[in-house]
């Protein structure tokens, strides 16, 4: 029996000039999602997808590389200006911001959208190293 030829859907080139960069920086990893203003994803990258493993994912350099990769993919779709939403306490926040600016994207605003508990759940116990 002959196999049916499956057609791969080609990525169409969207022409989106403005968007939002969501930088999610945890203690273990940094994820960058660039979406349009409505929230539809255009490009994304993370320290893990850039080839960093283990504790190297949480470094500022890994966040910088991930941000450069996401910005390059977004610029292929015509992205020029972005708003940045930063979430989380990780070490990759600042370096991801700098990398997005250095990649040629015009940053119009920076918002910190880290959720703050109003005395919610009990935090994890202190580490004893």
From Swiss-Prot:
HAMAP family: Ribosomal_uS11. It comes from the Bacteria. Signal peptide: none annotated. The keyword Ribonucleoprotein applies. Located on the platform of the 30S subunit, it bridges several disparate RNA helices of the 16S rRNA. Forms part of the Shine-Dalgarno cleft in the 70S ribosome. This is Small ribosomal subunit protein uS11. Transmembrane segments: none annotated. GO terms for cellular component: ribonucleoprotein complex; ribosome. It comes from Cereibacter sphaeroides (strain ATCC 17025 / ATH 2.4.3) (Rhodobacter sphaeroides). Belongs to the universal ribosomal protein uS11 family. Keywords: Ribonucleoprotein, Ribosomal protein, RNA-binding, rRNA-binding. PROSITE patterns: RIBOSOMAL_S11. The keyword Endoplasmic reticulum does not apply. GO terms for biological process: translation. Part of the 30S ribosomal subunit. Interacts with proteins S7 and S18. Binds to IF-3.
């Amino acid at each position: 029996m002959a196999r049916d030829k499956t057609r791969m859907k080609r990525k169409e080139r969207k022409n989106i000039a403005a968007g939002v960069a969501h930088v999610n920086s945890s203690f273990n990893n940094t994820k960058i999602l660039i979406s349009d203003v409505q929230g539809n994803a255009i490009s994304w990258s993370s320290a893990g997808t850039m080839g960093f493993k283990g504790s190297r994912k949480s470094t500022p350099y890994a966040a910088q590389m991930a941000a450069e990769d996401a910005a390059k993919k977004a610029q292929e779709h015509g992205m020029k200006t972005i708003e940045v939403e930063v979430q989380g306490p990780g070490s990759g926040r600042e370096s991801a911001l700098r990398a997005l600016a250095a990649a040629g994207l015009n940053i119009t605003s920076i918002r910190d959208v880290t959720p703050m508990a109003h005395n919610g759940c009990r935090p994890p116990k202190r580490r004893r190293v």
